[in-house]
Amino acid sequence: MQQRFTPRTGRRIAAGIAGAAAAALMLTACSGDTGSVDVADEAPDELSGTVSLWHFFTDREASVIQGVVDDFEAQNPGVTVEVHEGQDDEKLRKVIAAGSDDIDVGLSYSTDVVGNLCSTGAFRDLQPYIDRDEVDMSQISDTVQSYSEFEGTRCTMPVLADVNALFYNKDIFAEAGITEPPKTLDELEDIALKLTEYNDDGSIKRLGFNPFMGMYENTAAHFGPAVGGKWLDDDGYSAIGSDEGWPVLMQWQKDFVDEIGYDKLQAFTAGLGQEFSADNAFHTGQLAMTIDGEYRTAFIADQAPDLNYGTAPFPTATGFEDLYGAGYIVGNIAGIAKGSKNPELAWALLKYLSTDTDALVKMGNGLKNVPTTTAALESPDLEVSEQYQTFIDIALHPKTATTPPSLVGAGYTQAFGSYWEKFQAGTGGNLAEGLAGVDQEINDSVDLVSGP
């Protein structure tokens, strides 16, 4: 199966923290303006001309985007949209940094680039267009708004989102007499241990839940809402080491790993099928519970249609019960490239993709990602199964969290994730000292990009 470029896979193929800093420096060096442009007092009565759209989708998913583009052209007969599919973020940034005018609208799979694109002017400031056209930004949640702007500059608009939740196998639950999914991390561990089975040689046959950091969607970002983990302070520096929640979450996860055995978990995890294949361990019953995104519902429908499963918000830690029902959200973002030859037409297309209810619902149904406006989330035309409803509810929850844009892109999440994997292996040393080291690594990288 072809790898899908999304917020989840984008982070997997991204470079390390040094690479993120280097990319930011490259874009900064090649972008000298702020992205501010003169905007006409009124939007044109009639749209005409040619506008280019660069996006990362391929194959079936690209056809979904094309269908929405066709609708836009049908509503605006004088407009031609030149679509360039399969364009990843690295190419997008390089083309913009080179000063090319080939890109009008760029659609990215990751919010990791927002800090760079906004701060360097690689994407234009959209606020003048938003103000002029009186776009109702209140239809987009504060959290989603936060990951599509940087330090007061809105250079992107959100276009669909990924939301994470707990998946659980109803048949395995029923066999064990379990009637409800866990709501706390302690309940999650208790149920998981009850559902875990071993082979005669002591190796793991089935896991109730795999706590192993780095397995499938097991990341700090996805686990973080269980304690309301804070990433950055108001100045863009690391808040990880000073946050009260992260040590609680990390110690719970480490103790869970130790309860089963690091070596056993490592061996079991290494033998699991690929995440985006039919052999995904939740599909096969090797995992009774797992954390995953709304897109998993589409994979199950296609690859394991007989699987009897449910979804629920991911559990929260003791003392953080008020966060239950929330979760993690991140998504695709789109903006107008600084070299756009037709920014007015580019804005019209961007506004359509990011705020038109019919367009968002059509993309949501076709891609099985979560729409990013309240109107689209509540539209009767949105195809919502019982399992999918969980993700809608999480997206609408006021305490749902995200990873904020940064000058170092994904660098800060990668630095933390790297240390966490050492900690779970027992090689991370003292936790407080380790987190202080993570803070220092992140802050040094922010200073490197920020300059004197």
Where are these regions (language model features)?
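Conserved N-terminal structural module of periplasmic/extracytoplasmic solute-binding proteins
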Residues: Q2-G115, E134-M137, L272, T318-F320, ...
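Conserved C-terminal helix/tail region of periplasmic/extracytoplasmic solute-binding proteins
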Residues: Q3, A174-E175, L396-P452
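Short helix-initiation/N-cap motifs at beta->coil->alpha
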Residues: E85-K94, D112, L185-D190, Q266-H283
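Hinge/lid segment of periplasmic solute-binding proteins
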Residues: Y109-V163, K205, G224
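Extracytoplasmic/periplasmic solute-binding protein
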Residues: E151-V159, N164, E189-I240, G245
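Extracytoplasmic/periplasmic substrate-recognition and gating elements
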Residues: A176, D258-E259, D263, A301-K368
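Glycine-centered hinge/linker elements that transmit conformational signals in sensory
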Residues: A192-L193, Y237-A270
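Long, aromatic- and glycine/proline-rich binding clefts that accommodate carbohydrate-like moieties
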Residues: G364-G411
